[in-house]
A protein has these predicted regions:
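N-terminal Sec-pathway targeting helices
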Residues: 1-13
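Surface-exposed amphipathic alpha-helical segments
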Residues: 32, 37-40, 153-186
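Bacterial N-terminal signal peptides
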Residues: 12-20
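Intrinsically disordered, low-complexity segments enriched in Ser/Pro/Gly/Ala and basic residues
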Residues: 19, 23, 56-59
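Sec-dependent signal peptide cleavage junction
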Residues: 22-31
């Protein structure tokens, strides 16, 4: 009984930390280098540890973000917990491991999102989800598909997220592949 009581708080702490990885602001010294997708608009708040672009014609968003330094969990712990969290939220389509770009690897999640506003509502207690979703114009609340990649370099965790309306997802995904392949974490 005592061990079960200890495991519950530990599990909650690890889950909160893993989810915070994706949605927290960062104040780190690490740097992300990437070739931005052509014909996409950069977020004016982009910096060396948080980069977001938006494409008006397809209402798509891609972002690369470094986790805060206090979230130094190994990827092999964070990945499965994020998988379970997304499954519990009912948005996980599939999960696998991926190798991409400049010797990068990580966990990849494909997500089915009924609409950006419902996603915002379901993650309302988590900071920084808006940095990706609020760039989608109001009134464009259609079903979206998403891809989330968690990766780790030199002990730092990073999240890469791509969101696009379902009808455009595959074609826009092909368009941004060179951007994914150009990502370097220093």
């Amino acid at each position: 009984m005592k061990n079960r009581l200890l495991n519950i708080p530990l599990g909650v702490v690890i889950l909160v930390a893993a989810v915070s990885l994706v949605f927290s602001p960062t104040f780190a010294n690490a740097e992300i280098k990437v070739t931005p997708p052509s014909n996409w608009h950069a977020n004016p708040d982009n910096n060396s540890t948080s980069l977001i672009w938006f494409q008006n014609s397809t209402k798509s968003v891609i972002g690369v973000k470094k986790a805060p330094d206090f979230l130094s969990f190994p990827l092999f712990l964070a990945g499965p917990f994020v998988t379970q969290f997304l499954a519990d939220k009912g948005v996980l389509e599939s999960a696998d491991q991926i190798y991409f770009g400049n010797s990068n690897s990580g966990y990849r999640y494909f997500l089915n999102l009924s609409s950006p506003s419902k996603l915002l509502d379901s993650f309302s207690g988590l900071p920084q989800i808006g940095s990706f979703l609020t760039t989608i114009p109001e009134g464009y609340d259609v079903p979206y598909k998403g891809m989330l990649i968690l990766t780790q370099k030199q002990g730092d965790l990073y999240a890469i997220i791509f969101l696009s309306p379902k009808e455009n997802f595959d074609s826009v995904m092909k368009e941004i592949q060179p951007t994914l392949d150009s990502i370097q974490f220093n």
